């Protein structure tokens, strides 16, 4: 059986979890505590970079969200989450990459902002503008269709759909993109989306954790650099 190492709030793990549900594949969830478990030797033996998700399929192990999504689509093509039409496929890939390369960095920056402050930093303002610009692009690509590939739910929804719905709570409303807002609401009504939905308490805890993550990352980076230096010096 497929095994997914994940954390419920993980921005990277949630699309894989969602794809498994939408494809109606049997799988086992293995929760990982991102408070430090990802840096323990047992986990680093699974992924030397110390992050989720990880997918195990028998003896084969895959890391990185996009690689896992492509693996699932190639290995388990029914139910399909990719169109075969060239234009639709290009649209899906554009949405996936724009969501990860443009929208996700903005979301992460907004999650890290100090929401107790009355004044937005220049970085936060840029993140909001970047998110708004990306939403406008997605609105134009969606057009009047129910999904980015027309009538078929695809990896475009799987990736972008796990980010868009959280933006209003981060200070970026969807009201200027009514088609995208309706699209997001339809996705949230799907059983798979409801299954992965974070409770208000989980979302609040995740936001609080993200605000302290820069300090955690700095500490973990120093620890990792020390461990890597010892590893390479011992191999010389």
State where each predicted segment sits.
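GST-like domain detector, emphasizing the conserved glutathione-binding G-site
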Residues: 1-129, 139, 214, 223-236
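Short beta-strand edge/turn micro-motifs at domain boundaries
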Residues: 20, 192-193
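Short, solvent-exposed turn/loop segments enriched in Gly/Ser/Thr/Pro and often Arg
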Residues: 33, 155, 200
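Generic structural signal for helix capping and beta-alpha/helix-loop junctions
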Residues: 37-39, 184, 204-205
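Phosphate-coordinating loops and pocket residues in cytosolic domains that bind phosphorylated ligands
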Residues: 45, 189, 198
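GST-like fold's C-terminal all-alpha helical module
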Residues: 63, 99-191, 233-236
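Short, solvent-exposed alpha-helical surface patches in well-structured domains
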Residues: 91-94, 182, 195
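Terminal-tail/helix-coil boundary detector
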Residues: 193-228
């Amino acid at each position: 059986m497929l095994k997914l190492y994940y954390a419920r709030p993980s921005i990277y793990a949630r699309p894989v979890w969602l794809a498994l549900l939408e494809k109606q594949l049997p799988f086992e969830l293995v929760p990982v505590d991102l408070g430090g478990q990802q840096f323990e030797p047992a986990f680093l033996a699974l992924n030397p970079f110390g992050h989720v998700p990880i997918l195990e399929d028998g003896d084969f192990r895959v890391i990185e969200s996009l690689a896992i999504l492509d693996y699932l689509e190639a290995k388990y093509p029914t139910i399909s989450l990719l169109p075969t039409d060239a234009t639709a496929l290009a649209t899906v890939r554009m949405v996936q990459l724009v969501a990860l390369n443009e929208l996700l960095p903005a979301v992460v920056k907004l999650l890290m902002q100090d929401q107790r402050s009355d004044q937005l930093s220049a970085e936060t303002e840029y993140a909001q503008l970047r998110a708004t610009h990306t939403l406008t692009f997605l609105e134009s690509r969606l057009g009047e269709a129910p999904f980015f590939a027309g009538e078929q739910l695809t990896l475009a929804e799987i990736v972008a759909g796990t980010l868009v719905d959280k933006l209003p709570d981060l200070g970026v409303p969807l009201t200027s993109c009514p088609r995208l807002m309706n699209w997001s609401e339809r996705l949230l009504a799907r059983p798979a989306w409801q299954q992965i939905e974070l409770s208000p308490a989980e979302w609040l805890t995740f936001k609080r954790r993200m605000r302290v993550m820069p300090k955690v990352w700095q500490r973990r980076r120093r620890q990792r650099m020390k461990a890597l230096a010892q590893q390479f010096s011992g191999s010389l």
